[in-house]
């Protein structure tokens, strides 16, 4: 039996982090967690990490698509925070963002990690950006590092 899996060390990986500025008080903590994870666990060099900031979560897929189309990166981390309000806007933004990012991954055959919080309250978002519930930015980075290595291993074996 042949098992293909990836580890998290990716010293030479070139990683783009596409970040929504909306709800920046939460998203900046997600970014800190992602960068810390890339450096500490992935051993990714500063020069191999590019941060791209966009206005909001709806803009994440387009920026990720442009990054993927460049062919210069091994993976993309998307970070944002969509917090439910009193209108259906939350469902539209969260759904389109998720769908668009998944489409980029499939269209360009590049790992796109989803680190966009979709929470009911500000408190839940804060908890998931580095307090009680860990840092989902760091978790998104871990998943991305593993997928970069899985895809490289598949390329070598197939």
Curated annotation (Swiss-Prot):
CDD domains: Lumazine_synthase-I (cd09209). Coiled coil: none annotated. GO terms for cellular component: cytosol; riboflavin synthase complex. 5-amino-6-(D-ribitylamino)uracil binds at residues 22, 57-59, 81-83, 114. Keywords: Riboflavin biosynthesis, Transferase. Gene3D superfamilies: Lumazine/riboflavin synthase. (2S)-2-hydroxy-3-oxobutyl phosphate binds at residues 86-87, 128. It is an enzyme of class 2 (transferase). GO terms for biological process: riboflavin biosynthetic process. The active site is at 89 (proton donor). It holds the Pfam family DMRL_synthase. The keyword Transferase applies. It catalyses: (2S)-2-hydroxy-3-oxobutyl phosphate + 5-amino-6-(D-ribitylamino)uracil = 6,7-dimethyl-8-(1-D-ribityl)lumazine + phosphate + 2 H2O + H(+). Catalyzes the formation of 6,7-dimethyl-8-ribityllumazine by condensation of 5-amino-6-(D-ribitylamino)uracil with 3,4-dihydroxy-2-butanone 4-phosphate. This is the penultimate step in the biosynthesis of riboflavin. PANTHER family: 6,7-DIMETHYL-8-RIBITYLLUMAZINE SYNTHASE, 6,7-DIMETHYL-8-RIBITYLLUMAZINE SYNTHASE DMRL SYNTHASE LUMAZINE SYNTHASE. Belongs to the DMRL synthase family. This is 6,7-dimethyl-8-ribityllumazine synthase. The lineage of its organism: Bacteria, Pseudomonadati, Pseudomonadota, Gammaproteobacteria, Alteromonadales.
